[in-house]
Amino acid sequence: MEETIEDPPTSAVLLDHCHFSQVIFSSVEKFYIPGGDVTCHYTFTQHFIPRRKDWIGIFRVGWKTTREYYTFMWVTLPIDLNNKSAKQQEVQFKAYYLPKDDEYYQFCYVDQDGVVRGASIPFQFRPENEEDILVVTTQGEVEEIEQHNKELCKENQELKDNCVSLQKQNSDMQAELQKKQEELETLQSINKKLELKVKEQKDYWETELLQLKEQNQKMSSENEKMGIRVDQLQAQLSTQEKEMEKLVQGDQDKTEQLEQLKKENDHLFLSLTEQRKDQKKLEQTVEQMKQNETTAMKKQQELMDENFDLSKRLSENKIICNALQREKERLEGENDLLKRENSRLLSYMGLDFNSLPYQVPTSDEGGAGQNPGLVYGNPYSGIQESSSPSPLSIKKCPICKADDICDHILEQQQMQPLCLNCPICDKIFPATEKQIFEDHVFCHSL
């Protein structure tokens, strides 16, 4: 499949949040035959604009998020969106990457934000000749899938309710945290104002005390009144100090609560990070299993090719063997004919074929003059090699009184051409080129 190593953009968007009607799939079959490429036809609606990272995936029926795709192909962007033909597009899925089971699947168009923009009707991957058998099973599976979809919708609604509850709880906590922060800022501002006021008032009191001391020296009669005034001011200062301590203690409590909320937030973030790591490990495991499956199928194909080559060579060897067997039978037939012809000629000459020496010469006797293609050899080799003809082996013709009847027969036999025929290509070789003939036949088996 012509897809890049980069994973497509996905999201955990729920089914109710998708816009399935913005891309329309057409010409979707009820089932596709395994082993063949599948072409997906789709059409963009008027207000939908495709983007570069959009993709079409094959999902098993009952999927929840776009991360559950089986395989995908990138979408080809049309050159002119205003053209009507540009709205109708297609993409082809290679047979090797398609599902191998008979579950129900559907095409889904996903944009680069991971949001589903269109979904097709369900279909299967199964052989065509099983259509009649699968009619009842398909209906049962459809009912089972509908029941499963109802359960998934119910579970989905529960998850959405939980999600809304968690979102509301999170929103309340954020609002409470914001409120606490505002209160803390207000308290800090009040604290600063009080500190400034206390400092100013303390300075004022010190100045007033100094003035009172100066006045004490001048007005001894008013000393008691000023002492009472000092006591009152000191009591007021003590009360304000206690109030300030309470405010400081409240500020510390709010700070501790804020730290506790920060710790809880960090704990939740760490938990989310661990879950993402586990999900990434699972995705890597799935990818490794796909690679192992690809390697095994390649190895199986290589073994099948090797088995085919061996079968082909075995068939060729059988053909050569049969051809050699036929050639052997033909040569044996020719030898039998030659033996009968020799017996006839010897009978005509008055000689007994069985009483002749050198009838079946060995490899050391007369080997140079024999035909390498014959099994029984030349029956006249002994007569040709003798230095003088025996009176018992040669008879004169009673009619013509000729002594050269044997020479005539030998001359006629030597004039007969002996050839070797290739049983495969029918090429003819002289009898003296037996080695070349054998090398030629052996080359056919390579």
UniProtKB/Swiss-Prot annotation:
This protein's GO CC annotations: autophagosome; autophagosome membrane; cytoplasmic vesicle; cytoskeleton; perinuclear region of cytoplasm; PML body
Source organism superkingdom: Eukaryota
CDD domains attached to this UniProt entry: Zn-C2H2_CALCOCO2
Modified residues (Phosphoserine): 445
One of the GO BP terms on file: positive regulation of autophagosome maturation
Gene name for this UniProt entry: CALCOCO2
Chain positions covered by the region annotation Interaction with LGALS8: 371-381
Alphabetized GO MF terms: zinc ion binding
Residues spanned by motif CLIR: 133-136
Pfam assignment, any one: SKICH
UniProt record similarity statement: Belongs to the CALCOCO family.
Membrane topology according to the record: Peripheral membrane protein
Protein name as annotated: Calcium-binding and coiled-coil domain-containing protein 2
Annotated segments matching region Interaction with MYO6: 395-446
Main location: cytoplasm
InterPro entries attached to this UniProt entry: CALCOCO1/2_Zn_UBZ1 (IPR041641), SKICH (IPR041611), UBA_autophagy_assoc_protein (IPR051002)
ZnF locations on chain (UBZ1-type): 419-444
